[in-house]
C-alpha cells in the first residue's frame, strides 16, 4: 500500500514537473533562452528533496528486510555455531577432566602397588636374611658337633695309644731291667720281682 501511494505521489510529482518543464520550454522557446540556462545545473538525484519520501520508504523496506534476514537467518546461524562450539569446548573440557582423573587414579594405584612391592621386597629380604642366618647357625652347630665328636674320638684314640705305649714301655723296661740284672749280678730275676720293683719306684 505504501509503495502504491509513494509511486502515485512520485508519478504526480513527475507529471507536474514535466508540465512545468513543458510550459517553461514554451516560454523559453518564445524568448529563445534554454530552460537549464534559466535554472542552472540539475540537482544530484539522491539530494533532490522531491524524492526523499520514496527514498525513506525504500530505506525502511531495505532495513526491515535486512533486519529480518539478520534476525531469522544470520543471527540464529551464528548463535547455533557459537552454541555448538561452546558445547564442543565443554565436552572437550569434561573429557580432559575425566582423563585427568583417570590418570591421577592410575598414578595413585601405581604408587600404591609400588609401595606394596617395596614392602614385600623388604619382607622377603628380611625373611631370606633370617633364613640364611638360621641355616648358617645350624650348619655351624652341625660342624661344631661333628668336630667335637671327632676331637673326642681322637682324644680317646690318643689315650688308648698312650696307654698301650705306656704298657709297652713297662714291658720293655721290665725286659731291659731283667737283662741288666742278669748281666750285672749274673743271676736271674723273675718278672714279678721286676714289676714289684717298678711299682715301688713309681710309688716313690
Curated annotation (Swiss-Prot):
Compartment(s) where it occurs, according to its Swiss-Prot or TrEMBL record: Cell inner membrane
Region Disordered, annotated ranges: 8-28
Major localisation: membrane
Name the record gives this protein: ATP synthase subunit b 2
Transmembrane segment boundaries: 56-76
InterPro entries reported in the protein's UniProt record: ATP_synth_b/b'su_bac/chlpt, ATP_synthase_B_chain
Keyword 4Fe-4S among record annotations: no
Entry keywords, A to Z: ATP synthesis, Cell inner membrane, Cell membrane, CF(0), Hydrogen ion transport, Ion transport, Membrane, Transmembrane, Transmembrane helix, Transport
Record's subunit section: F-type ATPases have 2 components, F(1) - the catalytic core - and F(0) - the membrane proton channel. F(1) has five subunits: alpha(3), beta(3), gamma(1), delta(1), epsilon(1). F(0) has three main subunits: a(1), b(2) and c(10-14). The alpha and beta chains form an alternating ring which encloses part of the gamma chain. F(1) is attached to F(0) by a central stalk formed by the gamma and epsilon chains, while a peripheral stalk is formed by the delta and b chains.
Membrane topology according to the record: Single-pass membrane protein
The protein's role, per its UniProt record: F(1)F(0) ATP synthase produces ATP from ADP in the presence of a proton or sodium gradient. F-type ATPases consist of two structural domains, F(1) containing the extramembraneous catalytic core and F(0) containing the membrane proton channel, linked together by a central stalk and a peripheral stalk. During catalysis, ATP synthesis in the catalytic domain of F(1) is coupled via a rotary mechanism of the central stalk subunits to proton translocation. Component of the F(0) channel, it forms part of the peripheral stalk, linking F(1) to F(0). The b'-subunit is a diverged and duplicated form of b found in plants and photosynthetic bacteria.
Family statement: Belongs to the ATPase B chain family.
Lineage per the UniProt record: Bacteria, Pseudomonadati, Pseudomonadota, Alphaproteobacteria, Hyphomicrobiales
GO MF, any single term: proton-transporting ATP synthase activity, rotational mechanism
PANTHER family noted in UniProt: ATP SYNTHASE SUBUNIT B (PTHR33445:SF1), ATP SYNTHASE SUBUNIT B', CHLOROPLASTIC (PTHR33445)
GO cellular component, one term: proton-transporting ATP synthase complex
CDD domains: ATP-synt_Fo_b (cd06503)
Amino acid at each position: 500500500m505504501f509503495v502504491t501511494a509513494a509511486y502515485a505521489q512520485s508519478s504526480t510529482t513527475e507529471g507536474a514537473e514535466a508540465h512545468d518543464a513543458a510550459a517553461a520550454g514554451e516560454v523559453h522557446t518564445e524568448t529563445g533562452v534554454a530552460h537549464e540556462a534559466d535554472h542552472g545545473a540539475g540537482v544530484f538525484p539522491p539530494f533532490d528533496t522531491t524524492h526523499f519520501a520514496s527514498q525513506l520508504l525504500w530505506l525502511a523496506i531495505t532495513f526491515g528486510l535486512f533486519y529480518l534476514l539478520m534476525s531469522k537467518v544470520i543471527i540464529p546461524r551464528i548463535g547455533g555455531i557459537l552454541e555448538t562450539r561452546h558445547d564442543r569446548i565443554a565436552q572437550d573440557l569434561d573429557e580432559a577432566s575425566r582423563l585427568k582423573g583417570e590418570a591421577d587414579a592410575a598414578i595413585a594405584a601405581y604408587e600404591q602397588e609400588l609401595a606394596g612391592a617395596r614392602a614385600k621386597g623388604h619382607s622377603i629380604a628380611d625373611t631370606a636374611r633370617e633364613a640364611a642366618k638360621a641355616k648358617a647357625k645350624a650348619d655351624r652347630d652341625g660342624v661344631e658337633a661333628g668336630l667335637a665328636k671327632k676331637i673326642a674320638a681322637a682324644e680317646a684314640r690318643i689315650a688308648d695309644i698312650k696307654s698301650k705305649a705306656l704298657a709297652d714301655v713297662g714291658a720293655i723296661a721290665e725286659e731291659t731291667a731283667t737283662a741288666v740284672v742278669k748281666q750285672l749280678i749274673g743271676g736271674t730275676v723273675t718278672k714279678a720281682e721286676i714289676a714289684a720293683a717298678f711299682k715301688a719306684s713309681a710309688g716313690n
